[in-house]
C-alpha cells in the first residue's frame, strides 16, 4: 500500500534578542541563562552519565544508548558527544536517538550553534552531515562509527513506536536485547506541546527501557510526573536549574500493561539466542558480505569471509563503475521509503570514503526523460523537488547537455549527489581490517549447526550470515526464499575526443559512464532467469544500440575493448532479503491463524534458526541499499536498538514471503 509523502514542515524561527523563538509552539528554544549549563545540569548530571560512562566495559561491542524526545538545536547531542569523548572508554560507542517534528533548517541550526564555540568541533561535523529534511529516519555516523545519531523526523509518538518489536510490554521485554540507557525528555512546555508528554508516549518509553534506565527532564509538571509513574518509573526529587524550583529525574522499575489495540504480531523478529563468542562467518565476498564484515569488525567482532572466487568483489559486485542513484517517488510505500533512506545514508558513507580513497566520483548523474512514461514520472516529482532540491532538479534539454558536457536529445532529472563507485576496489577497502579474515576459492554447499556454533568447511562461528547472492537459497534451510537470478552484461568501448567530454553518468533505457582510463562502460542487459554469466556479442550490440539512443549526436566508438557479465539476485518485490532466517515449517504452524485475519495478534516471535541471517537479493541497486541494510543487520546481531523503523524491517524480512503465502494461500 502507498500514500502520498507528507513533507516535513521545518521550524518557523523568530529571533528575539538574539535568541531563537518557535512560532509553532510559542516558546523559546533556550533561555539566555540556559544553554550548555542547563543541559549539563538537567540531562548529564540528572542521568548521572559521567559516572556511568566511566564504569563501562572497554570493548567496541559495548553501546550506550541515549534517546531524546526533541532534537531542537542539537546542543544536547553535541554536548553529550563532547563529554562522551572525554569520559567514556576509548573503544565504547555512543548511539544517540532523537526526534523532531519541525526540525531547524541548516542555516537556522548554524546560527543557533554559533552561540557555543566550545562545541565547534562537534558542530562542524554535525553541520557537514546534517541530512536532507525528508520525513522518517536518518542515520548519521561520526568518528568512524564511534558516535552515531539516529534522527527521526516526524511525530514523536509515531517515530518511537516504530522502534518497538510488537507493542506488548511483556513480550517486548522478552524479545528485547537492546534498551535505551538514558532518556532526555526535552520538548517545549507540556502546556504548549502536549503530544510530547502524552501517556501513550511514556508507555512506549517504558517498553524501550530496562531497570537501569534513567530519565531526566527540566519539567516538574504534575502531568509529567503522573505519566511517568503510570508507565512504571519511580520519580526522584531534584532541584531545578537556576531559578527553577524543581526538575524531574526518574528510573524505570517495573512493567505495566500496554494497550491491546497497539499490539503487532512480531513475525519479523526472533527470540534472543545466546552468543558465547563474538565470531561471525560470512558466505559471500561481494558488496553485501564485505559491508557486513566491515560493520561487525568495527563493533569488535572477529569475522571470516568465505568467497567462491579468488578474490572479493567478483560476481555481481565486479562493476568498476557502479552507479549510485535513488528511486524517487511522491508516494510513500515500504519500497520508496527504503530506497530514500538507503540513498541518503549511502551517499554519506561514500562521501566519507572518497575523502581518503580515489574510488569514484559523486558529481551527480542524469536520468533522462527518454520516453513519455519516464517524462510523466519525472513531472510528478515537481512539488517534491521544490521542497527538496538537494534530492534532484528537473532540467530541460539545454540544461541536461550543459550538465553532462555532451549534446543530449532531451531533458531529465539531475541527481546532484549521486555518481559512481568502483565496487571491487570498495570491497578491498572494506575488508582491510585486522579482524577480518578472507578464505577464497571455496564454494559452500552445506551449512551445519552443532547446537552451539555454525560450522562451514570445518570453520566454526557463533553467527552465520549468508550473503551469497543468487545462491542464497541453495541450502535446505533457505530453499523457501524466492530469489531470482537476473543476468546483466556491461560493454567497454574506446573513448573518443568527443565522448570524453561526458562528465557524469547518463541513465535511460541503458546507461553510460564517463571515460575512465580512455574507455566508457555501457550497459546493461537485463535477462531475468538467467543464472550463468556467459558473455555474448548480441548483448554488446544491444548496449551499443541503446547508447546511440541516449546521445545520438555523439560519435561513439564501436570498438569493443572488453565486456563483463554478472548475476544480480532479486526478490519478487525488488526489496532485499535481510534479517534472521525463519524455519519455514515451524513458521507456518505458529502463524497459521493469520490466514483468517492478517492482523490477528499472535503472542509469538518468529521461529528462526539460531544466529543464522540472510543478507541478499539487492538487485541492481546494491550500491545504494547495501550500506544501510548491513549497518542495521550488524546492529541487530550486536544487540543494538534498531536504526530502521519496524515497518521497513518487516519489508526486508526473510519471513515476509512465508507470511504472505499463509495469508493469500497456495
Swiss-Prot record:
The processes (GO biological process) annotated in the record are: methylation; tRNA wobble base modification
The record's catalysed reaction(s) read: 5-aminomethyl-2-thiouridine(34) in tRNA + S-adenosyl-L-methionine = 5-methylaminomethyl-2-thiouridine(34) in tRNA + S-adenosyl-L-homocysteine + H(+)
Q: Which domain of life is it from?
A: Bacteria
Extract the ranges annotated as region (FAD-dependent cmnm(5)s(2)U34 oxidoreductase). 283-666
Provide the residue span(s) of the region labelled tRNA (mnm(5)s(2)U34)-methyltransferase. Answer: 1-253
Matching entries from HAMAP family are given as: MnmC
Q: State the family named in the UniProt similarity comment for this chain.
A: In the N-terminal section; belongs to the methyltransferase superfamily. tRNA (mnm(5)s(2)U34)-methyltransferase family. In the C-terminal section; belongs to the DAO family.
Protein name, as recorded: tRNA 5-methylaminomethyl-2-thiouridine biosynthesis bifunctional protein MnmC
Amino acid at each position: 500500500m502507498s500514500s502520498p509523502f507528507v513533507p516535513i514542515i521545518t521550524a518557523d524561527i523568530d529571533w528575539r534578542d538574539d535568541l531563537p523563538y518557535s512560532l509553532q509552539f510559542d516558546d523559546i528554544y533556550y533561555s539566555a541563562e540556559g544553554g550548555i549549563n542547563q543541559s549539563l545540569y538537567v540531562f548529564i548530571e540528572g542521568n548521572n552519565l559521567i559516572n556511568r560512562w566511566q564504569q563501562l566495559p572497554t570493548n567496541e561491542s559495548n553501546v550506550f544508548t541515549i534517546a531524546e524526545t526533541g532534537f531542537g538545536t542539537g546542543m544536547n547531542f553535541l554536548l553529550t558527544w563532547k563529554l562522551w569523548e572525554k569520559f567514556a572508554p576509548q573503544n565504547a560507542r555512543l548511539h544517540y536517538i532523537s526526534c523532531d517534528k519541525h526540525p531547524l533548517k541548516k542555516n537556522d541550526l548554524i546560527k543557533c550553534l554559533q552561540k557555543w564555540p566550545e562545541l565547534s568541533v562537534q558542530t562542524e561535523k554535525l553541520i557537514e552531515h546534517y541530512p536532507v529534511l525528508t520525513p522518517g529516519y536518518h542515520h548519521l555516523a561520526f568518528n568512524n562509527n564511534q558516535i552515531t545519531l539516529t534522527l527521526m523526523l516526524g511525530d514523536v509518538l509515531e517515530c518511537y513506536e516504530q522502534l518497538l518489536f510488537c507493542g506488548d510490554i511483556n513480550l517486548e521485554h522478552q524479545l528485547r536485547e537492546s534498551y535505551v540507557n538514558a532518556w532526555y525528555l526535552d520538548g517545549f512546555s507540556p502546556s504548549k506541546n502536549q503530544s510530547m508528554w502524552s501517556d501513550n508516549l511514556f508507555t512506549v518509553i517504558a517498553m524501550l527501557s530496562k531497570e537501569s534506565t534513567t530519565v531526566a527532564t527540566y519539567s516538574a509538571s504534575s502531568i509529567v510526573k503522573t505519566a511517568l509513574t503510570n508507565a512504571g518509573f519511580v520519580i526522584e526529587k531534584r532541584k531545578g536549574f537556576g531559578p527553577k524550583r524543581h526538575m524531574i529525574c526518574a528510573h524505570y522499575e517495573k512493567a505495566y500493561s500496554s494497550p491491546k489495540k497497539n499490539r503487532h504480531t512480531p513475525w519479523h523478529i526472533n527470540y534472543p539466542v545466546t552468543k558465547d563468542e563474538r565470531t561471525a562467518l560470512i558466505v559471500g565476498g561481494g558488496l553485501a558480505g564485505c559491508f557486513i564484515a566491515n560493520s561487525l569488525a568495527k563493533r569488535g567482532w572477529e569475522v571470516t569471509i568465505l568467497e567462491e572466487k579468488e578474490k572479493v568483489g567478483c560476481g555481481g559486485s565486479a562493476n568498476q563503475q557502479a552507479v549510485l542513484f535513488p528511486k524517487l517517488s511522491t508516494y510513500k510505500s515500504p519500497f520508496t521509503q527504503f530506497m530514500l533512506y538507503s540513498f541518503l545514508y549511502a551517499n554519506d558513507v561514500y562521501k566519507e570514503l572518497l575523502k581518503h580513497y580515489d574510488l569514484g566520483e559523486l558529481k551527480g548523474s542524469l536520468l533522462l526523460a527518454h520516453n513519455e512514461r519516464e517524462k510523466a514520472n519525472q513531472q510528478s516529482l515537481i512539488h517534491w523537488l521544490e521542497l527538496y532540491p538537494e534530492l534532484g532538479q528537473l532540467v530541460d534539454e539545454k540544461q541536461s547537455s550543459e550538465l553532462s558536457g555532451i549534446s543530449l536529445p532531451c531533458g531529465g532529472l539531475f541527481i546532484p549527489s549521486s555518481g559512481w563507485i568502483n565496487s571491487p576496489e570498495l570491497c578491498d577497502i572494506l575488508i582491510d581490517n585486522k579482524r577480518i579474515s578472507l578464505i577464497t576459492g571455496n564454494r559452500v554447499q552445506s551449512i551445519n549447526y552443532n547446537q552451539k556454533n555454525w560450522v562451514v568447511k570445518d570453520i566454526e562461528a557463533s553467527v552465520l550470515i549468508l550473503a551469497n547472492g543468487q545462491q542464497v537459497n541453495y541450502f535446505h534451510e533457505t530453499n523457501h526464499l524466492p530469489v531470482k537470478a537476473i543476468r546483466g552484461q556491461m560493454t567497454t568501448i574506446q573513448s573518443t575526443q568527443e565522448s570524453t567530454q561526458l562528465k557524469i553518468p547518463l541513465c535511460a533505457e541503458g546507461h553510460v559512464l564517463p571515460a575512465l582510463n580512455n574507455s566508457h562502460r555501457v550497459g546493461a542487459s537485463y535477462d531475468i532467469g538467467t543464472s550463468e554469466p556467459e558473455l555474448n556479442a548480441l548483448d554488446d550490440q544491444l548496449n551499443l544500440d541503446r547508447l546511440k539512443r541516449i546521445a545520438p549526436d555523439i560519435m561513439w566508438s564501436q570498438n569493443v575493448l572488453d565486456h563483463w557479465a554478472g548475476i544480480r539476485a532479486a526478490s519478487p518485490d525488488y526489496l532485499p532479503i535481510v534479517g534472521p532466517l525463519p524455519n519455514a515449517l515451524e513458521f507456518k504452524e505458529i502463524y497459521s491463524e493469520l490466514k483468517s485475519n492478517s492482523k490477528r495478534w499472535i503472542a509469538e516471535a518468529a521461529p528462526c534458526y539460531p544466529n543464522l541471517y540472510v543478507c541478499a537479493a539487492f538487485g541492481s541497486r546494491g550500491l545504494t541499499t547495501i550500506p544501510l541494510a548491513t549497518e542495521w543487520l550488524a546492529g541487530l546481531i550486536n544487540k543494538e536498538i534498531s536504526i530502521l523503523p519496524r515497518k521497513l524491517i518487516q519489508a526486508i524480512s526473510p519471513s515476509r514471503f512465508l507470511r504472505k503465502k499463509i495469508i493469500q494461500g497456495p
